[in-house]
Amino acid sequence: MGDDELSEIRKRRMAQLQQQAGDQQAMQEEVERQQRLKSQIQMVLMQVLEPDARERLNTIRLTKPDFASAVEQQLVMLAQSGRLRQKITDAQLKDLLRQLAPAKRDYSITRK
């Protein structure tokens, strides 16, 4: 191996390491952005939900995280648009959940 080959290998390796460092930094920034967004959503939910409604939403999050996220987004939109005049009670949250829940299919099996 000549000096030219070694320097070329070093340059490629250095470029590869710099690329990896840049990727790690971008990934870390994305994680931090998601954490900030999550904390902002939690702050809004604390302002618009009563404790029992918040507890119900947390329970739903354990079983259906996607559905809970959709409900949270809906609540944040309502809060930001100014449509919420008071905190949402557990009964009001139940009504909202019924409206947002996908329609269940009812199957009936008849035997001959």
UniProtKB/Swiss-Prot annotation:
* Keyword check for Manganese: no
Q: Which GO terms describe its molecular function?
A: DNA binding
Which cysteine residues pair off into disulfide bonds? none
Q: Does the keyword Ribosomal protein apply?
A: no
Cross-referenced Pfam families: dsDNA_bind
Going by the UniProt record, its keywords in alphabetical order are: DNA-binding
Q: Which InterPro entries match?
A: DNA_bind_arc (IPR022889), PDCD5-like (IPR002836), PDCD5-like_sf (IPR036883)
This protein's GO cellular component annotations are: cytosol
Give the highest taxon in the source lineage. Answer: Archaea
HAMAP family from the UniProt entry: dsDNA_bind
Q: Which family does it belong to?
A: Belongs to the PDCD5 family.
* Name of the protein this chain belongs to: DNA-binding protein Mboo_1886
Species for this entry: Methanoregula boonei (strain DSM 21154 / JCM 14090 / 6A8)
